[in-house]
Amino acid sequence: MTRTLRLGTRRSPLAMTQSGLVAAAVTAATGRAVELVEITTYGDTSQATNELISQIGGTGLWVNSLREALLREDVDFAVHSLKDLPTAEAEHLVLAAIPEREDVRDVLVARDGHKLADLPAGARIGTGSLRRAAQLRLLRPDLEIVPIRGNIDTRAGFVSSGKLDGVVLAYAGLSRLGRISEATDYFDPAEFLPAPGQGALAVECREDDTALREALAELDHRPTRAAVVAERALLATLEAGCSAPVGGYAQVHHDDEDELTLAGVVASAEPRDGAIQSVHGSLTGPTDEAARLGAELAARMLAQGAAALMTAAAVQVGDSQ
């Protein structure tokens, strides 16, 4: 009898839902049963102390415990939100599949059905992301941005309870939980860049598990992989962590899948001299050179002062602790 595969997942409702989708796809592709193994990460436990991700620092807060379970062979493979995955490769592990991406957009969940443009001045909008906070301030400097933590239930609850006027969340998370109807506004990713890898899932297994690697490869979506490779190369070359005020979005061209366009932004986390400062850039090139395109765009942005903005953001976060 073929052994049931063990899939490591975080315990949150969203993580369990995402892992369930991957488990079903693996079963459909291989005929093998998949068991979800719940694992608590540091990112999960830190929520109990209400620490902001931007203040904790470091990388891999949501993935290290899953990777350790893989290396101990407690699980056979693991599913991560790709935007949480550090850009440095993990020794003895491989990114076996990146399934087709969900919608990359950020959305607003606001009281009374408000859109971003018609929120009153001084409205309190919650987010735990420096990237979202910076871009909100670029679009609506008259809003009050409130740092928050928690899962989707907790964040949306700040609005329904009246503590906040709105929160910014990822479309993908709301959609996978069947709650996208709660969104009151949808941000154009050309104007409000998502996090690198947002909306994509990462399926990771041990490098030496050849049979499982081959099976998981059936879930891989080439255009999505090319796009996130470019975005993650941008992030890696900027030497920015997943909590930095960096946005990146690559689109494989619909009429020519051999080409993609990558856009990036680095912004100051707080106003400087009365305004948010930012560096934007974009680049088009072959999909099979996605990593080079990401590195090249990052180099251009660094030449325009992106490093100073990220350093300032780190100092501002440190001063707030």
Label every PLM stretch briefly.
Residues 75-79, 165-166:
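Short, Asp-centered acidic motifs that coordinate Mg2+ and/or phosphate
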Residues 49-77:
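Short, structured active-site "lid" loops
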Residues 86-87, 176:
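Short glycine-rich, flexible loops that bind phosphorylated cofactors or substrates
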